[in-house]
Each structure stands twice: as structure tokens, then as C-alpha cells.
Amino acid sequence: RENLAGIKQTTFVLIKKEEAFHQLSEKRSRDIIFLSSNQSLLDLARDVDVPAIAYQKPETDTFLHADMVVEGFEEVDMTFLQRVYERHFNIPWTILETERCIVRELELSDLDALFSMYAEPGMTDYMEGLYEYEEELEYQKAYIENMYRFYGYGMWLVFEKKTGTLIGRAGVEHREELNGDMELGYAIRTSFHHQGYAYEVCQAIMQYAREV
């Protein structure tokens, strides 16, 4: 089946021996998503750069390590497989689309566009600006690793569909001052104010948060 990650079909292969895994991975390493409850095989997948899902059996105490860990298979659909594939190969998740916008995770190549947006007059009148470039780069590296990868949410980027222009940031985060409750935050590029983008995107994010 075709989907956004380029996965054209799903084939399930039962692997009983490590040799069979190596033979399969050598032929189609970018076309495999591996699922196992065996940490040794999951480690093999990591070593040959194959996306892996760990099945954590409910009765076991040992915690498995992989790109994703599941305790059941109800959530393992094509969207879930796409997320695993993208996370493994550092492809930013597209969170949602609205009529005019695409909301997706930040990747490091977005940094120049982010600095350009924050340089617009009035952009930081009511919020903090960015760090110096190198410090911001390190901050975003840590954010991608610790927020996106661990929690699966955070502050995302907002792009105008028609032009591909970065027009803002929006997302949800836990706030300690709110007793750990979720807070919706957003910032729209100054030159795109008063066009309904904030309302459009925030409504979609609230709906997304309720569903997931």
C-alpha cells in the first residue's frame, strides 16, 4: 500500500535465525521495519541500520530498546510504521495539515529560516528570542532527541502550503508551573499576522491532541 513514507507494500517475514536476518537486511536494508521481542535481534537491526519495533511482553520485567516499543498490536498500523521509519532515519514527522498550512517537526536545516523569521520587527516583543546560532543549534539538537524522540510532541514549525514559507511555530508542552498540565503555544511570523493562521493552526493542534 502506498503511503507518505513511500512504503508501497507490507510483507511479514518470520525470521528464526540470525543468518536469515543478515541476508534479508543486506538486500533491502532501507525497505525493512523489524519487529521482535528478542533484544539480541533488535541489536542486530540497530547494527545494520534497520528500523526496529520492540514487542514488550506484558509479563516480562526486562525493558527492551528499539526505535519504538509496543505492548500490543492495536496501534501498529501503516501510520505507526511510517512514524517508526521516519524516526529511525531522522525524517521530521508531519504532524498535521490544515487548509493553508503544514505543521511538522523542526529539523536542523530549518535553522536559517527560523532565524530569518525571528529577525522580523516585532517578532520578539512578547516572547524570548533565539540563542546565538551555535548555541541554538545545540539546543535544537537536544530538543529533537529529548522531546520529539521521547515524547512524540513539542513545539513544531508551521509552513504555508502555497509557498512553503516558514510562517510560525506552534505546539504543546508540559509546563511545571501548570502542575505538569499541557500548554498550547504559538507564534506567527509578523508579516502573516491578521490572516487567521494562528486560529486555524491552533484549532487543528487541539483536535490532534484530543485524538492522540
Regions found by a protein language model. Give the residues of each.
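Asp-based, Mg2+/Mn2+-dependent phosphohydrolase catalytic module
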Residues: 1-96
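Conserved acyl-CoA
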Residues: 7-8, 24-28, 191, 198-212
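Glycine-centered helix-boundary capping/hinge motifs
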Residues: 49, 152, 194-196
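GNAT-family acyltransferases
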Residues: 68-191, 203-208, 212
